[in-house]
Amino acid sequence: MKKTPLLNIALSRVIASLGHGDILVIGDAGLPVPPGVELIDLALTQGIPDFISALRIVLSEMQVESHVLAEEILLKQPPALNELNTLSDEAALGERRLVSHEAFKQLSRKARAVVRTGECQPYCNIALVSGVTF
């Protein structure tokens, strides 16, 4: 059995297959998944799992170079934004880029996979750009 926190087989497989610059999206329950992009559906019910818990577990296995958020998250100020800022301050997310929510949805078309959580706070979506460990 794995020793790291991430136990989901599909998610672990996708992270292990990422190359430098590849994108993994973690989204709330309402984020549309583009046709042809793999969906890893973790959602059980509203709020379970929450966005931040899923993100923290992904970060336990993924080297992140940068991340993209929809700028609307700054307007709505969901509680998850404080956690995102903390992770940014800890350098776990690399450089931040803000785009419109529509541009974020277009970016998700390039993702290797979209991880759907049960999160129901507005704009709790992040595109993680894979880095390298060397």
Swiss-Prot record:
Enzyme Commission no: 5.4.99.62
Highest taxon, organism lineage: Bacteria
Annotated binding of substrate, by residue: 28, 101, 123-125
Chief localization: cytoplasm
Record-linked SUPFAM superfamilies: RbsD-like
Catalytic center residues: 20 (proton donor)
InterPro entries membership: D-ribose_pyranase (IPR023064), RbsD-like_sf (IPR023750), RbsD_FucU (IPR007721)
UniProt GO BP: D-ribose catabolic process
UniProt similarity note: Belongs to the RbsD / FucU family. RbsD subfamily.
HAMAP family reported in the protein's UniProt record: D_rib_pyranase
Name recorded for this polypeptide: D-ribose pyranase
Name of the gene: rbsD
